[in-house]
Amino acid sequence: MFLMNILCLIIPILLAMAFLTLVERKILGYMQLRKGPNVVGPYGLLQPIADAIKLFIKEPLRPLTSSKTMFILAPTLAFSLALSMWIPMPMPHPLVNLNLGVLFILALSSLAVYSILWSGWASNSKYALIGALRAVAQTISYEVTLAIILLSIMMLNGSFTLSTLTTTQEHLWLIFPLWPLAMMWFISTLAETNRAPFDLTEGESELVSGFNVEYAAGPFALFFMAEYTNIIMMNALTTILFLGALHNPLFPELFTVNFVTKTLLLTVTFLWVRASYPRFRYDQLMHLLWKSFLPLTLALCMLHVSTPTMLAGIPPHM
């Protein structure tokens, strides 16, 4: 039965991830006044299936000097972690209702750094290694602000369980009182998932394709799938944290529809940002975090710790 639950969680995620690639290409196409994929199937709807078949039947070549075990292990780890992060997500019922769901997601997103580092190191290519080092520095840096923002929200929530956030936001979405944090959170999620304008790891002019430059066929597809699964996961988390979906215990379907709609809108915003903004310079990326976001999030975190205490509005279970 539990295996069935896991399959019911993973299959919709994989389908959503497959069609997100199509949605991205369509949106970018229409924003550049062209059609996007429209040959495979009606309106190009079968394009993701064609892409998957093409990638998985190709021969998985690897460089002669690469480290074989790590080269295969890195993409597998990346994709496994991307799927594991969905375990504590309330939609409206999580697969496993963890007490420290937020901490679990943070820990797994930190582990994803290893898959990037290993892939760059195992490829034995200078481009892949430089791309991996950039990606690791960027991911670790932006995780600092993500953790502090999450801490502020958990102070207001009174618990590290994601499910209680729906109760917290019954009367007011947290995006209204916490809009500065929401803005910084959204920008940090863009950087965390290596998306434009923060896709420094894939600087075509200097690094070809970044840490996955030596990958082809199946292993490359796993990295690709991990990236898009992470994008949907981050937007789902943003929805839970800031745009608390309507939860009526009598009609749990309403929660799911509400949740999916908000996540979809946020994902389209991700793609819109990609179509609109040029890439940052690497020093600007780091300055934005360490000189702007970190002091601001720390100040706001102190505010959110002190205000409830000052007004004696401490959550009862703390």
Swiss-Prot record:
GO cellular component term of the entry, any: mitochondrial inner membrane
GO terms of molecular function: NADH dehydrogenase (ubiquinone) activity
Bilayer disposition of the protein: Multi-pass membrane protein
EC number: 7.1.1.2
Assigned keywords, A-Z: Electron transport, Membrane, Mitochondrion, Mitochondrion inner membrane, NAD, Respiratory chain, Translocase, Transmembrane, Transmembrane helix, Transport, Ubiquinone
Catalyzed reaction equations: a ubiquinone + NADH + 5 H(+)(in) = a ubiquinol + NAD(+) + 4 H(+)(out)
Protein name per its UniProtKB record: NADH-ubiquinone oxidoreductase chain 1
Gene from which this protein is expressed: MT-ND1
